[in-house]
């Protein structure tokens, strides 16, 4: 690996780790209704499993309700089944092609569980970042051993890798702090 590409490659890997964290945090329920909450729902449609968003329009008319407007009337029962199978802890009311999902308020205990889960996701992401950093440092050691870079360059590039890791680690902290605030706000 070339020393010039190393930082860029590490940055891309760290960016992916942050994206994964973002997707995991989207799945955590806050007290508010959000269509992102249904991202994990898949529906049996025309012989294959597809995301819910491909067979229905999703909207939040208020802070406590998600509406699922199914486009094809024959798909309503499949959508209901998909929502049930996703095990989101939601009940639904069907009115023709419209499925309403009332979002119950979270108890204090449940909010704390979600905060713990958010912190767990954050810690897993930080572990990924540290592993990416370790791989980068090992690559630098290999470049130094092969006399592609000198010791001063190795130390300089190692510091850059550490700064990059610190930068992404602080992004994880702020994402977790923001999600914790969302969850704990009643």
Curated annotation (Swiss-Prot):
This is Ribosome-recycling factor. One of its GO terms (molecular function) is ribosomal large subunit binding. Disulfide bonds: none annotated. GO terms for biological process: cytoplasmic translational termination. The keyword Cytoplasm applies. NCBIfam families: frr. One of its GO terms (cellular component) is cytosol. It comes from Rickettsia typhi (strain ATCC VR-144 / Wilmington). Responsible for the release of ribosomes from messenger RNA at the termination of protein biosynthesis. May increase the efficiency of translation by recycling ribosomes from one round of translation to another. Keywords: Cytoplasm, Protein biosynthesis. Belongs to the RRF family. The keyword Protein biosynthesis applies. It is found in: Cytoplasm. Transmembrane segments: none annotated. InterPro entries: Ribosome_recyc_fac, Ribosome_recyc_fac_dom, RRF_sf.
């Amino acid at each position: 690996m070339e020393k010039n590409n190393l930082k860029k490659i590490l940055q891309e890997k760290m960016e992916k780790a942050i994206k994964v964290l973002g997707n995991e945090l989207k799945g955590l329920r806050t007290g508010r209704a959000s269509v992102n909450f249904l991202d994990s729902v898949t529906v049996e449609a025309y012989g294959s499993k597809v995301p819910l968003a491909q067979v229905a329009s999703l909207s939040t008319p208020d802070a406590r309700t998600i509406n699922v407007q199914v486009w094809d009337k024959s798909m309503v029962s499949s959508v209901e089944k998909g929502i049930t199978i996703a095990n989101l802890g939601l009940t639904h009311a069907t009115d023709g092609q419209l499925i309403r999902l009332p979002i119950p308020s979270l108890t204090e205990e449940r909010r704390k569980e979600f905060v713990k889960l958010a912190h767990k996701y954050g810690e897993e992401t930080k572990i990924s970042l540290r592993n990416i950093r370790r791989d980068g440092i090992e690559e630098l050691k290999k470049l130094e051993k092969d006399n592609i870079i000198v010791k001063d360059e190795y130390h300089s590039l190692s510091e850059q890798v550490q700064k990059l890791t610190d930068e992404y680690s602080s992004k994880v902290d702020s994402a977790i702090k923001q999600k914790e605030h969302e969850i704990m706000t009643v």
